[in-house]
Amino acid sequence: MKKKILFISPTGTLDNGAEISIVNLMEYLVQTGHQVINAIPDYHVAVQQDYISSLAALAIETIALPSVKWWWEDAPGGLPGSPESRARSYQENTSALRKILTERKIDLVITNTVNMFQGAVAAACEDVPHFWLIHEFPDGEFGYYKEKLDFISDYSQKIFAVRGALQRQLQELLSNRKVLSFAPFTKIHPTNTGEKDRAERRIVSVGRLTERKNQLELVKAYNQLSQPKPALVFIGAWDEEYKKQCDTYISEHQVKNISFLGHKDNPWAEVTAADLAVFPSAMETFGLVYIEAIMNGLPTILSDNPGHLSAYEIFEEGQLYSSGNIEELADKINLALANFEGLKDQSVANLGKIQERYTVQSVYQTLLDKIENTEMYKANSLRHVKCLLDTNLPSQQASSFLRKVKNKLLSGRRG
């Protein structure tokens, strides 16, 4: 049975993996006959209009709701406005979502990322099944949601987490629930990287230069490589303060042959078949850039952070090193450079297997199965008091007794 599905999206932009992944899922659902509506916060920025137009071209309707803050109060993003204005905004957003559910006869609500709760509450009020897709580890900037897992459990018929380390961690924290899995998906069109014999060997790392991406670790390992060593190339924009840290280390240790290319619309067009890809991230939710590298047939070395491990468990391609162990990383790079031709041939030979494992259908199979079977879910008891969440109730005048008390107090002050 085909369904009307309402997605609650975190930003209404295509500059993050969670949004990119879910748009691909929404597109697939439309192609298979479902009707998809997408709710986003309206921040009145041009990039959101591009996002809305892109989704409209895929037959996905987007509804932008004015919002003081779309995410939980203690989620990243600060505290814009006053406590009263945020509370009112949450109420109005929840009310607007409830109206969409009833007027559009929505069959299922899916909240994409842990950071929004309005869709879960609206679904509970209107007796509509709700699925929650969690991309974030409950640590660091997203550690705030660990104490909200009871709410997440109470207001979700099904909970999904990125497969691997995150799924296992949440399963331990939600021992009374079955946490299901998915993997983020991005469309990858392998780039023609040219013949490997026509380009110089290089070490490349694609991605924004940030403390979390941890490229300084690669710079330090590069400084320890055996001579002669190939060029090290970073492709991606950067955070200014972190770039200064890298520049300072390079200058103080007189490290040569490192270049920073900055942002490129198609970073993989800068890569050649003679390149070795290295990703030293300290933390990732999922290793999308690692997947892009192996789907371009590049020999790859990656740190063993939980997000990388989650992706590695699917493909088992490339070489892992212990995050933070600079000596081990240097050894892995030296060995990979010495055996590059064999690693390259192996990477190219495995491309067919990798492409078969990474499709929308395969990474979202469990979710797709559950979407087809939402009829048996138990209603949430919040529906019995949903009138308390209405925002269109008329303001009540104070009773005559209360007015007399107020007047008495005021006259006492004047006396």
Task: Give the residues covered by each predicted segment.
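Nucleotide-activated donor-binding/catalytic signature segment of Leloir-type glycosyltransferases, i.e.
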Residues: 244-262
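Aromatic "clamp/platform" in nucleotide-sugar-dependent glycosyltransferases that forms part
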Residues: 263, 282
